[in-house]
A protein has these predicted regions:
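Sec/Tat-exported extracytoplasmic proteins
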Residues: 67-70, 81, 85-88, 115-119, ...
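Extracytoplasmic thiol/disulfide redox context detector
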Residues: 2-103, 218-224
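Extracytoplasmic/secreted proteins, especially bacterial periplasmic and envelope-associated proteins
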Residues: 62-65, 76, 80-83, 106-110, ...
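C-terminal cap of thioredoxin/glutaredoxin-like
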Residues: 5, 151-224
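Structural microenvironment flanking redox-active thiols in thiol-disulfide oxidoreductases
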Residues: 87-118, 122-150
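Solvent-exposed loop/turn segments at secondary-structure junctions
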Residues: 70-73, 100-104, 131-134, 167-168, ...
């Protein structure tokens, strides 16, 4: 989903997860097409004009997934991303960063970082997507989010303590700063090593975007 689509969408569409993906992102690419042409800078991925600081330890290649819980395409991408993470080389450090293209995205940013602070991302991350896109629940506001989290067996008071904390607010702000530093134009999107950016529009689809990340990581290992 492109940034301009978020700007044009109304509150009803946001809650329903009914925003439309640009045609370019929905296109498919066959394995033969991927193998027949090496990814090209400026076409399949972007090299950032200014490097972005990374959080990965020395010797690790940081890969960031930018996402939004209410984005249907992020929901669709999750199984493929999870499978890719499981088979990724050990030198890749993968982390998720929720975006905030508008102020009303911030509650879901805080949701993710509160779950992270409580060690509940592995347990509840996919369930958040399911609640929004399968059960059609509106988790766009703090009260609805807290009520849903409580139904998952999480102490509501402790969750809200994290949700409203300075540390979670700071992480949300830094997430938005990181999104802007990478010049994220839509989600899902992938940032690599503070140097490269790709998404479904550039790569033609997100499966190929992951292949491009593999290509870029290989280049970093070889000193390119």
């Amino acid at each position: 989903m492109k940034r301009r689509d978020f700007s044009l969408a109304g509150g009803v569409a946001l809650a329903a997860g009914a925003l439309v993906l640009p045609a370019a992102r929905a296109q498919t690419t066959t394995p033969a097409q991927v193998q027949g042409k090496a990814p090209q800078a400026g076409e399949d991925y972007l090299a950032l004009d200014k490097r972005v600081p990374v959080d990965a330890p020395a010797g690790k290649i940081e890969v960031i997934e930018f996402f939004w819980y209410s984005c249907p395409h992020c929901n669709t991408f999750e199984p493929a991303l999870d499978a890719w993470i499981k088979r990724a080389p050990k030198d890749l450090a993968v982390r998720r960063v929720p975006v905030a293209f508008r102020d009303d995205f911030v509650p879901q940013q805080r949701l993710f970082y509160a779950l992270e602070a409580m060690g509940l991302v592995d347990q509840l991350h996919r369930k958040v997507f399911a609640a929004i896109h399968v059960e059609r629940q509106d988790l766009a506001r703090a009260d609805a989010i807290a009520a849903w989290v409580a139904k998952q067996g999480v102490d509501k008071a402790k969750f809200l303590e994290h949700y409203n904390s300075f540390s979670v607010a700071t992480k949300a702000t830094r997430g938005t700063q990181l999104q802007n530093a990478y010049k994220v134009e839509g989600v899902p999107a992938l940032g690599v090593a503070g140097r490269f950016y790709t998404d479904g529009t550039l790569a033609k689809n997100m499966d190929r975007a992951l292949q491009i990340v593999d290509f870029l990581a290989a280049g970093i290992r070889s000193g390119r």
